[in-house]
Design a protein with these regions (language model features):
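Active-site regions of metal-assisted phosphoester/phosphodiester hydrolases
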Residues: 10-54, 66, 78, 83-86, ...
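A short beta-strand-loop structural module common to alpha/beta enzyme folds
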Residues: 56-61
Length: 255
């Protein structure tokens, strides 16, 4: 199921006045921080502090028992003053669980693809949104791929991403998410056939994102499609323990 939550003006703030945009990807661990408290306000505060225009969220609850059956996508939309598109990947504790995108830009259309599964486990998906960015279409993709030690499922997920983007050829694409694999892995090598890892071109340092209190691995990424008229100006990892991951933020220029 897909849901659209609207709060405030879609074109408010920085997004309406500049040809640059800020993108964030953030696995929010259903809003639970390293202190084991669920606090959506601090997630929204971080988004606002980083002045993000588009945010890819993973591990988002809607009507789930562990988060008191709250409509977390709608709450995050209201707290951030943005539009939220939520995609359910599987039913959990009486509610829905999946990915979501917050955006200041108008949403033209969206769809969600459930990945094929080779083994029983958590259903994963690819949320695909076409945004109107200053009169130009931008394809924004949000995913959370398989986490298990054997990369068979992740490689299949990467193949499905390559298949899913075929209708968007010729348009700039930004792919965000938790890939549960490190740079140089077979998963990332597959994704890199179609996309450029923006940390490799505009990041400083190692870009480690998990665990949040003392990160040891980089598994969260912002990618841009090769040849896209989008330039990564800088990419960084803010310090935060509002989730078990740290977010990744990138500033981009539309050429």
């Amino acid at each position: 199921m897909l849901a659209l939550c609207v709060a405030g003006c879609q074109t408010a703030g920085k997004a309406a006045t500049t040809n640059t945009l800020r993108v964030m990807t953030y696995n929010i661990h259903h809003g639970e921080g390293m202190d084991r408290k669920v606090d959506l306000q601090r997630i929204a505060d971080l988004i606002k502090h980083e002045q993000a225009d588009i945010v890819a969220l993973q591990e988002v609850d809607k009507g789930v028992q562990r988060t008191a059956k709250r409509d977390c996508p709608a709450e995050l939309a209201a707290l951030s003053g943005m539009t939220c598109v939520f995609s359910n990947n599987y039913h959990f504790q009486g509610g829905e669980y999946g990915n979501a995108v917050l955006t200041r830009f108008p949403v033209k259309r969206w769809t969600n693809r459930h990945y094929k599964m080779l083994r029983p486990g958590e259903q994963r998906g690819l949320l695909q949104i076409v945004l109107d960015v200053h009169g130009r279409e931008l394809v924004f993709l949000d995913t959370h791929v398989d986490f298990r030690g054997n990369d068979t499922e992740r490689l299949l997920n990467a193949d499905e991403i390559a298949e899913a983007i075929q209708p968007y050829r010729g348009r700039p694409m930004i792919l965000c998410g938790d890939f549960n694999d490190t740079p140089g892995s077979r998963t990332c090598q597959k994704v890199a056939q179609e996309f450029t890892d923006t940390w490799s071109t505009a990041g400083t340092g190692e870009g480690l994102t998990i665990p949040a209190e003392k990160p040891r691995k980089r598994i969260d990424y912002i990618w841009i499609s090769k040849g896209a008229p989008v330039e990564a100006l800088r990419v960084w990892v803010p310090e935060s323990e509002a989730s078990d991951h740290r977010p990744v933020v990138g500033e981009f220029k539309l050429r």
